[in-house]
């Protein structure tokens, strides 16, 4: 599948039962702020995001995280064909280290962690599919 510039509704987890079926599984990997889960489906790759107010109180921050995650997934969607991927924020960001709710350091931190998790998830998907990851 060729990665396109669009991120259609079909590429997202939307319903509660879709999220629940992925959440029931053990998390694959963690970073300081995020956890990633995956579930084989045999269909096109889909992304679910759980960015709660408990860990990102300001809407600006939640929207920034979601935008970065969607873009990172959209550009690598072909690597996750046949899988539902769920990304969850599980820790607060240090307010003292981040000058504002949508600062460049916060965006860089989130983008780096999301990229790292997607790299690990792509390797896990490739391992479970019995193929070599595209990055090797």
Swiss-Prot record:
The gene is rnpA. Transmembrane segments: none annotated. GO terms for molecular function: 3'-tRNA processing endoribonuclease activity; ribonuclease P activity; tRNA binding. HAMAP family: RNase_P (MF_00227). It comes from the Bacteria. RNaseP catalyzes the removal of the 5'-leader sequence from pre-tRNA to produce the mature 5'-terminus. It can also cleave other RNA substrates such as 4.5S RNA. The protein component plays an auxiliary but essential role in vivo by binding to the 5'-leader sequence and broadening the substrate specificity of the ribozyme. GO terms for biological process: tRNA 5'-leader removal. PANTHER family: RIBONUCLEASE P PROTEIN COMPONENT. The keyword Transmembrane helix does not apply. Pfam families: Ribonuclease_P. This is Ribonuclease P protein component. Belongs to the RnpA family. It comes from Burkholderia pseudomallei (strain K96243).
């Amino acid at each position: 599948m060729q990665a396109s510039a669009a991120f259609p509704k079909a590429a997202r987890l939307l319903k509660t039962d879709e999220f629940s079926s992925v959440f029931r599984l053990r998390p694959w990997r963690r970073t300081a702020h995020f956890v990633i889960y995956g579930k084989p489906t045999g269909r096109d790759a889909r992304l679910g995001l759980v960015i709660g107010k408990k860990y990102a109180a300001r809407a600006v921050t939640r929207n920034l995280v979601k935008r970065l995650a969607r873009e990172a997934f959209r550009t690598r969607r072909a690597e996750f064909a046949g899988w539902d991927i769920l990304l969850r924020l599980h820790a607060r960001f240090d307010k003292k280290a981040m000058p504002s709710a949508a600062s460049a350091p916060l965006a860089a931190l989130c983008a780096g962690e999301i990229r790292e998790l997607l790299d690990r998830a792509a390797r896990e998907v490739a391992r479970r599919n019995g193929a070599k990851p595209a990055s090797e």
